[in-house]
Every structure is written in C-alpha cells, then in structure tokens.
Amino acid sequence: MNNWKRIVVKVGTSSITDGRGSPSGEKILSLVKECVKLIRADKELVLVSSGAIASGREIIQKLSKRKDLPAKQALSAVGQVRLMQYYSQLFSIFKQPIAQILLTAEDLRDRKRYINISQTFETLLEEKIIPIVNENDTVAVEEIKIGDNDTLSAKVACAINADLLVILSDVEGLYSEDPNISSNALLITDVYEIDESIEKIAGPGKGTGGMFTKVQAAKIVTEAGIPMILARADVENILERIVLKKEKVGTFFYPSEKHLNKRKHWMLFMAKPEGRIYIDDGAKDALLKRGKSLLPVGIKKVEGEFTRGDTVSIFDLRGEEIARGITNYDSLELDKIKGKNTEEIRNILGEDFYEEVIHRNNLVLTNRGDL
C-alpha cells in the first residue's frame, strides 16, 4: 500500500442518519473528527456526502411521503442547507474550513468545465480546505443526473487525481454472496480485476446505493490507476485505521495495471457520446488488434447529430459498442464520406480534410480486456 496523500471519502445516507432517517449529530461528529485527524496528518481530503433529502424530510415532513421528482428536488434544496449547517458547525469546533461543491453529470461531461472543476478542487486542497461534494439534485433532471454518490465519488477522485477512494457503507465490504441471505457469505478482501464474476456478485439492477453502484465506482477509479477501499462506516476510527495505520479493512480494489491516461479515461467514463458510428469488420480489426485510427473507408452507417470535437460511440455491425473517440468530422460531413477512400473524399470535400475520422490518440476501447 502506498503513502496516500489525496483521499476521497464517500459516506452514504445511512452512515450519517439515525434509525428514524434523520441526520445524526453523533454520527456526523464522529466523521468530522476522523476527517480532521487526516488533515492534521498532512493529508488532502474531499468528502462526498449523501443525506440532503433525509435532512430535508426532517424539516418539511409533509413532502416526505411524496415520490415525485419536484418533491425530491425541493427536499434536497432545503436539506442540503441543513446538512451543510451540521458540517459547518461541527467542523468549526476544530477550526477546519470547508467548502460546498454541487455537481451534475453535465459538469463532468463538458471537457472545459471538467478541467475548471479540477482546478477549483486543486486550489481548495492546497489551502487545506475540505470540499464537501454532493450531486446538485435540485437541477439534475434525468439527462444530467449522475444518479448516485458512489459514481459521483469515483468521478471526483479521477478529476482530482486522488491517491485513494474510500467508500464507507453499512456493510463490511464485498461478499461472495448476500450476507443477509446466506450464512456461507465470505468477505472478499482483495479484488485484483473487476471482471464478470465480480460484477455478477454485485448483482443486477442499477440501484442508487447498492453493491452494483459500488463495484461500478471501483471500475471507474481502478481504470484511472486509483485504488478503492469499501468498508463499514460505523467501525471506530475507520479512516485512521485505513489511511494512517494502513490496516487491512474491508475490500481493497487494486488499480488496473493497464490504466488509462486522464484524457482517455474522461472519454470513456465522463463524456456523453453524441452519436454512433457503425464500422465493418476490417475497421474493427484495425482498431482492436492493430491499434489503428478510424478511417472513413471502414464506416458503414452514421447515427445522430454531432459536431467536430464531440465524443461518439463506435459500434460493430452486430450492434456491440467497441470504442469511443473524439471525431474530426461532424455527422453531415461523415455521412457524405463514409465508405470512401482518400481520392473520393478529396473530390467531395476538396483538399482540406482529415485522413482519420478519429485518430488513435483520441480513441479508447470500451472493452478493456481487448487491450
């Protein structure tokens, strides 16, 4: 284990609320003490905290029974203020400054905003300020929702080049089976690769806080070369034991040996594909087996509307996504030159054109096992 300097810690709602679902001052104080301990040990810390909606229910009880989106967003708007009051009051006891950052998926999909957010985090961390992060539920309609704070914490960890992501939960780690159902369930202490067997253990269904989202979070960070630890939140001094004492706790997800550079990682996990390009088997082999750029001649079909510089998905003729990349052509241009060779393209577009639709430096394979 390395000497981790920059750590992202994610806590779920159950880790900071009481049995009635209301924010627990005792639990939050315990978390605050742990965070301060890390800062005083010269660590840099980002805290991704759920609990806004639960905090809102405490204040506006008549909305708490409604399940519609506007009610949830109203609860989040009220609850986020209440949650930050808890954190502000308790961190102030230790004279520890904090900041609030609310994000949507759109903030991370847009490359310029992504870089700007990274720089904001950088400045806060340099000043020993703890950013407290949550999804901006009040404005996050379905199209721009990140969806869960496990995923959010993983994307934040990648954006700031963290050394470690710690997800604190109500379970000790990843088990071989559901420990609530099977007495034969065993704690998996080490995960070296997130393959189909690990994803199967995590279960189906893309819930907003279950084991599936935690394993997907691990997949995001490990592909960026960042390890992740999944551990139980209510274990005494859990962060000190993990970060400072380097104790073996919970499940440790090891970083991928062939992890992606930051740009390609952003393309695969952050950017939203604006269209689809379908390619023939020859072009597929060139991408997967020979590491080549994508040329117009291998393209069979173009779907969607996109402009130069957008991220697009690349599919084979069987409908399987094989890669993503940044296109040199917009969808109208590409539709004109698909399947054409260089001379034919010159006759269509003139002398000013790109030989590659997507250069290999701007292309990343979606199935990392193909690398």
Curated annotation (Swiss-Prot):
The keyword Nucleotide-binding is annotated on this UniProt entry: yes
Locations listed in the record: Cytoplasm
InterPro entries: AceGlu_kinase-like_sf, Asp/Glu/Uridylate_kinase, G5K_ProB, Glu/AcGlu_kinase, Glu_5kinase, Glu_5kinase/COase_Synthase, PUA, PUA-like_sf
Catalysed reactions listed for this entry: L-glutamate + ATP = L-glutamyl 5-phosphate + ADP
Binding site for ATP: 10, 169-170, 208-214
Principal cellular location given in the protein's record: cytoplasm
EC class name: transferase
MF annotations from Gene Ontology: ATP binding; glutamate 5-kinase activity; RNA binding
SUPFAM superfamilies: Carbamate kinase-like (SSF53633), PUA domain-like (SSF88697)
Entry keywords, A to Z: Amino-acid biosynthesis, ATP-binding, Cytoplasm, Kinase, Nucleotide-binding, Proline biosynthesis, Transferase
Known EC number: 2.7.2.11
Record's GO cellular component terms: cytosol
The keyword RNA-binding is assigned to this record: no
Residues reported in the UniProt entry to bind substrate: 50, 137, 149
Pathway(s) of this molecule: Amino-acid biosynthesis; L-proline biosynthesis; L-glutamate 5-semialdehyde from L-glutamate: step 1/2
PUA domain segment(s): 274-352
Gene Ontology biological process terms from the UniProt entry: L-proline biosynthetic process; proline biosynthetic process
Biological role stated in the UniProt entry: Catalyzes the transfer of a phosphate group to glutamate to form L-glutamate 5-phosphate.
Family assignment from sequence similarity: Belongs to the glutamate 5-kinase family.
Protein name: Glutamate 5-kinase
